[in-house]
Amino acid sequence: HRHTAKQLLAAAGIPVARGAKFTKWPDAKAAFEHSFAHKSIVVKPEARSQGEAVEQFSIPPTEKQFDRAFHEANRHHGVLIEMMARGTTYHFTIIGQQVLSVLETAAANVVGDGRKAIKELIALKNGHRATSRQLQLDASARRQLKAQALTPETVLQRGQQVFLTTAAHPQTGGDLYDVTDEIDDSYKQLALKAAATLDLPVAAVDIVIDNLYAPYDPEADGQAN
């Protein structure tokens, strides 16, 4: 589970996002009122969920938004609430002591052409994708559109980009860009250390990185999480 993995990584000196695990709403609500109410946070299931029920609030959430995100994430083994790290999520695929690929991830989105409605753009993009990476026009996506004063029927201006999710994950329709040859090698070493710490010969490691070209500095706060 994520919380146990974070404890092991932190003990090994690997940077992890600050946060806590909650299983009961009264405890989470109290923590929200005292700690999280005015901060950018991430709410996600404690068990890995392939990007499902993960909500990122770059703008601090209202109590109503936090309530909904907590209960959507709290379906199995509790909820992790973390401080939101600055930067972009990079997905490292590791086998043995080798990084096979590094993919930059972007949240599910569509780009307008001045003619098609958002729902048509989603269908068009899904037509070129594997079933496992389809964009979803679900309740969460509709909330994201509503927050941007948009509906599935809205026709976007040419070049206008609209995001359907807050979290970047390929399983929820996110975009992927291969940066294996571009990213500084220090982050590959960090990912390998994380996999070794968790004793995983085959691993997928996600790291939020502020600048993929700047070498990793353990003393620099917030450079990688």
Where are these regions (language model features)?
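Conserved N-proximal alpha/beta basic substrate-recognition cap immediately N-terminal to
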Residues: 1-30, 34, 49
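Short glycine-biased active-site loop of nucleotidyltransferases that positions the nucleotide triphosphate
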Residues: 32-33, 93, 215-220
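Acidic/histidine-enriched active-site and ligand-binding environments that engage anionic O-linkages
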Residues: 32-43
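Glycine-rich phosphate-binding loop of ATP-grasp-fold ATP-dependent ligases
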Residues: 41-68, 89
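Conserved hydrophobic "DFG−1" position in protein kinase catalytic cores
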Residues: 56, 94, 207-209
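Phosphate-binding site of ATP-dependent enzymes
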Residues: 60-169
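ATP-dependent carboxylate activation and anion-phosphoryl transfer catalytic cores
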Residues: 98, 106-113, 166-225
